[in-house]
Every structure is written in structure tokens, then in C-alpha cells.
């Protein structure tokens, strides 16, 4: 899929982890609703729990946001739901809760975080195939994006990267596609 210059990914500010600050906690349903209410597309980060549920959370360790020093993917959804975010009433939302809240009102930029269980890719694709809103999928893991494209060729996808030096050590198939998906046509 070729993306035009006026595609939302290139023309609109994107609320990273929702619209948060002050009393509003990042990656919370309140932050996502604030972004939606202000018309911003939203970037969300996905992790798979120990019991194979997808949650929206940025860090792989829970400590910064909950005070519990544990990898998010070592915990069940029930355990995660018992942990308040930064001492508030907010809890870590599931992907399904976020999709139900947003309901296609604003686009979503969905990052699949690198983690030990790559089943997250298949489960994310399965869920997104039934979502009616606009979205794009991204990851630092090129194998995740390759899998997404095999399962859902029509999904808009992109590979995240950090430094030119790292690009030199990428597998050849990644070097061939690294800049194609998120660059608009001239």
C-alpha cells in the first residue's frame, strides 16, 4: 500500500502514550480519552501477559509506573489489573479496552514491543482484523513486522530504528524495506 502525503501518519501530531501529564497518567484509558477528545491519533505500546492477554504499557518492567519490580510479561492479567498506575485508580488497560474506547474515532499507531513470546503478533493481527478504525503497526523487531505483513498484507506497517550504525547490521530483507512503508509518495 502506497501512502500519500496527506496520510494521517504524516500530517497530524500523534499523542505518544495518550495525552498525559499532571493528573493524567500515561498509557491509561484517561490519557487515551483525552487524546481522542482533542482529535489526536494515539500511539500505544503492546505487551503480552503470562496468560496471553494483550495490554497497553510502555515499559517492559512495571516498576516505574506501579512500584512492582517485575517484567510485565511475567504477570497475569489479573495481577496487572490489581496494580494501580502511579497510585491512582487507573489500571493497565487491555488492547480490547482501548479499541472499545477509541472505536475508530481517531487513528492508532500501534507498537508491538519486543518480548519473549512472539505469539503477540498473531493475537494482535487477529484482534485488529476485526477493528473498524484506522491504524498502523510498528515495531523495532523486523521479524514481527514481517509476520504481520504475512498475516495481513493490507495492514500499514513500519519498522522502527534508532541509529544508522545499527542499520548496517540488519538482515538483508530488512535493509530492502526499512524506509518504504512510512515514506509518503512524492
Predicted regions and their residues:
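Phosphate-group recognition and catalysis centered on beta-loop-alpha active-site segments
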Residues: 1-186
Amino acid at each position: 500500500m502506497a501512502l500519500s502525503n496527506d496520510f494521517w501518519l504524516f500530517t497530524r501530531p500523534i499523542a505518544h502514550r495518550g495525552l498525559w501529564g499532571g493528573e493524567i497518567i500515561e498509557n491509561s484509558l484517561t490519557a487515551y480519552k483525552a487524546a481522542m477528545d482533542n482529535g489526536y491519533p494515539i500511539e500505544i505500546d503492546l505487551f503480552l501477559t503470562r496468560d496471553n492477554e494483550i495490554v497497553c504499557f510502555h515499559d517492559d518492567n512495571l516498576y516505574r509506573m506501579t512500584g512492582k519490580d517485575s517484567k510485565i510479561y511475567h504477570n497475569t492479567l489479573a495481577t496487572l489489573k490489581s496494580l494501580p498506575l502511579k497510585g491512582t485508580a487507573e489500571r493497565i488497560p487491555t488492547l480490547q479496552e482501548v479499541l472499545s474506547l477509541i472505536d475508530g474515532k481517531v487513528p492508532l499507531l500501534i507498537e508491538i514491543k519486543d518480548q519473549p513470546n512472539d505469539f503477540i503478533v498473531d493475537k494482535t493481527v487477529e484482534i485488529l482484523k476485526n477493528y473498524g478504525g484506522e491504524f498502523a503497526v510498528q515495531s523495532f523487531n523486523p521479524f514481527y513486522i514481517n509476520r504481520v505483513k504475512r498475516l495481513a498484507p493490507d495492514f500499514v506497517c513500519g519498522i522502527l530504528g534508532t541509529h544508522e550504525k545499527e542499520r548496517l547490521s540488519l538482515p538483508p530483507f530488512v535493509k530492502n524495506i526499512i524506509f518504504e512503508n512510512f515514506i509518503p509518495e512524492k
